[in-house]
Amino acid sequence: MAKKVKKTDDISKKFGEDRRKALDDALKNIEKDFGKGAVMRLGERAEQKVQVMSSGSLALDIALGAGGYPKGRIIEIYGPESSGKTTVALHAVAQAQKEGGIAAFIDAEHALDPAYAAALGVNIDELLLSQPDSGEQGLEIAGKLIDSGAVDLVVIDSVAALVPRAEIDGDIGDSHVGLQARMMSQAMRKLSASINKTKTIAIFINQLREKVGVMFGNPETTPGGRALKFYASVRLDVRGNTQIKGTGDQKDSSIGKETKIKVVKNKVAPPFKVAEVEIMYGEGISRTGELIKIASDLDVIQKAGAWFSYNGEKIGQGSENAKKFLADHPEIFDEIDHKVRVKVGLLEDEVLDNNQETVELPETDEFILDLDDAIEIED
């Protein structure tokens, strides 16, 4: 019986060696025909962790799970009109430029406001802009920019405005059933591999439509067919919520709106998380506002009554004064932002340690003590 087992083991070993040799020969032939790296073992990849670029919003980075938009992937941002879709995309453009990258904006809607983009931090002198005449032209331009490997971010605004050439050349009222969906399906097939290879982030902004005759379930859908839904690694649903009223002379005016960004699809982290941000008119997402809220929830910033404190020092009475303080002191903003990202697991605590001194809060006249602790000043 022992001899039979040994013989069987020898046969299995020889069979395994033959399979290994056949696999090695196949890999050599594939490499010869299609180039090095056409097939590789997953553990041999230099970068196994998904690389990300910050969205430009701390709350959205946390909701995305990975700390930002994954590089080499397709992102879809959709929502109702005036919900803040383009604002979210422009913050990504500003962040890409801040990190030294090159961004392109395909303005199919022909509605980009350069002044507003600049207010959000976009360097409009360096931003590549295209306003195509047709959907095919816009997608071809995006494809050539991606294929170059020199562009870090491409934004297409919007899918609904990518009108096929046949529809433009035809008459109003002509039927073009499924034409845009076929165009988008072909574009996704062509662009997806190039996007992944060049590590370009492609953001598609989309609008909402309603299905006719839907009695049960959600009647909302996005134009352009289903291809974009399948190819997108991340899908964001942007919805404007309540209006933000001003203070003082602007107490009766709306100065912004609270916005919820829901991650409805996420291939790199758990989905269905929600980021709540304040979009201020003319300014974009209030980065100081979201930082104060999140840092207070994590006890990085302490709140007692109306006062906000950091490192034992008061930084402002009321959220507006605290926002102003952080806006005036970017080094303290960056320090708090880093601590928050470490606490939520987006960063490792490799910058701030026991041997490194934290930023000292400046002494200014605007930060006074409570009335009980007030100091009487003699004449």
UniProtKB/Swiss-Prot annotation:
Predominant location category: cytoplasm
One cellular component (GO) term of this entry: cytosol
Domain of life: Bacteria
Keyword Membrane (UniProt): no
Intracellular or extracellular location(s): Cytoplasm
Biological process terms in GO annotation: DNA recombination; DNA repair; SOS response
PROSITE patterns, per the entry: RECA_1 (PS00321), RECA_2 (PS50162), RECA_3 (PS50163)
Residue positions binding ATP: 79-86
Keywords, comma-separated and alphabetical: ATP-binding, Cytoplasm, DNA damage, DNA recombination, DNA repair, DNA-binding, Nucleotide-binding, SOS response
Pfam families xref list: RecA, RecA_C
InterPro entries assigned to the protein according to its UniProt record, in alphabetical order: AAA+_ATPase (IPR003593), DNA_recomb/repair_RecA (IPR013765), DNA_recomb/repair_RecA_CS (IPR020584), P-loop_NTPase (IPR027417), RecA-like_C (IPR049261), RecA-like_N (IPR049428), RecA_ATP-bd (IPR020588), RecA_C_sf (IPR023400)
GO molecular function, one term: single-stranded DNA binding
Stored HAMAP family: RecA (MF_00268)
Function: Can catalyze the hydrolysis of ATP in the presence of single-stranded DNA, the ATP-dependent uptake of single-stranded DNA by duplex DNA, and the ATP-dependent hybridization of homologous single-stranded DNAs. It interacts with LexA causing its activation and leading to its autocatalytic cleavage.
Family according to the record: Belongs to the RecA family.
UniProt-recorded name of the protein: Protein RecA
Gene label: recA
